[in-house]
């Protein structure tokens, strides 16, 4: 684990009101834009503006998910894994599989799964592509990136995760009991999970966040993350107050 300052080529944050997006300046040769379809609100950094095409793709992606939920309301409501039928779309199946691996409901994987689906679809058109969906990110990149870890919106980020070109594509998904509107049964300020799968990173962030209630639980979180390594989890960062724990492929750098 390194704490040597690194050049910040781009950063993504977790924040309550998404005001952090105003501070995300794209690198030279890149643009940033927003894509909103119903409840899905994406912040994207790419080599060119792909917002129109992404909006159309997002409509098509959400349609089968909404139809499946209408026919199977337990998929939306359950806090535990559910079985899916043969009529399920790839997105619905990916979310269900990730939820089963982590012991949570399938909607715990939705933001990360959507971020990856969008990023993978448009990476051929923009090899440098960062898709952030409410603190859940999927990244393709030809250059180093630093992802800021924002546990306290008032204080700003002091640590970031350095990712090198060999690390991409990858997902970084977050869970917090103190930031944002997503359900967490824990009390942690920030759980950030790295994985190749967006659905898995998102589901794992929820599952690990549910474990973090006191500082004594930090070691429990890292042990649980390590147990999920065979499923595809590469690393975790956990913070509660002034205490942090890190496991796996998480190269931290100081920001500021």
Question: Where are the model-predicted features located?
Answer:
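A glycine-rich, hydrophobic loop/mini-helix early in the fold
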Residues: 57-125
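Polybasic, low-complexity association/targeting segments
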Residues: 35-72
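Short beta-strand scaffold segments in enzyme catalytic cores
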Residues: 42-44, 136-140, 147, 236-238, ...
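Short beta-strand elements
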Residues: 32-36, 44-46, 149-151, 193
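Flexible, glycine/charged-enriched surface loops at secondary-structure junctions
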Residues: 69-83, 128, 214-245
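N-terminal basic/disordered segments at the start of proteins
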Residues: 2-40, 50
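Conserved, well-ordered active-site substructure
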Residues: 246-256
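Conserved mixed alpha/beta catalytic, RNA-binding, or beta-rich assembly cores of soluble enzyme
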Residues: 94-104, 108-118, 122, 126-221, ...
């Amino acid at each position: 684990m390194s704490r040597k300052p690194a050049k910040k080529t781009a950063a993504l944050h977790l924040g309550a009101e998404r005001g952090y997006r105003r501070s995300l300046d794209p690198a030279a040769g890149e643009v940033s834009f927003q894509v909103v379809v119903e409840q899905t609100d994406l912040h994207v950094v790419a080599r060119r503006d792909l917002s129109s095409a992404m909006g159309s793709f997002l409509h098509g992606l959400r349609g089968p998910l909404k139809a499946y939920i209408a026919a199977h309301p337990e998929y939306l409501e359950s806090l535990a894994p559910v079985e899916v039928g043969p009529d399920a779309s790839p997105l619905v199946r990916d979310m269900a599989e990730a939820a089963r691996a982590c012991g949570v409901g399938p909607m715990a994987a939705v933001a990360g799964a959507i971020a990856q689906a969008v990023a993978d679809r448009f990476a051929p058109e923009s090899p440098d592509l960062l898709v952030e969906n409410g603190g859940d990110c999927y990244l393709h990149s030809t250059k180093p990136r630093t992802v800021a870890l924002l546990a306290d919106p008032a204080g700003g980020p002091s640590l970031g995760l350095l990712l090198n070109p060999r690390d991409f594509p990858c997902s970084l998904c977050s869970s917090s009991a103190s930031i944002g509107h997503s359900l967490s049964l824990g009390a942690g300020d920030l759980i950030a999970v790295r994985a190749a799968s967006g659905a898995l990173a998102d589901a794992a962030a929820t599952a690990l966040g549910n474990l973090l209630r006191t500082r004594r639980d930090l070691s429990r979180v890292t042990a649980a993350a390590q147990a999920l390594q065979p499923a595809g989890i590469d690393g975790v960062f956990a913070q509660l107050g002034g205490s942090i724990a890190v496991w796996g492929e998480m190269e931290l750098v100081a920001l500021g």
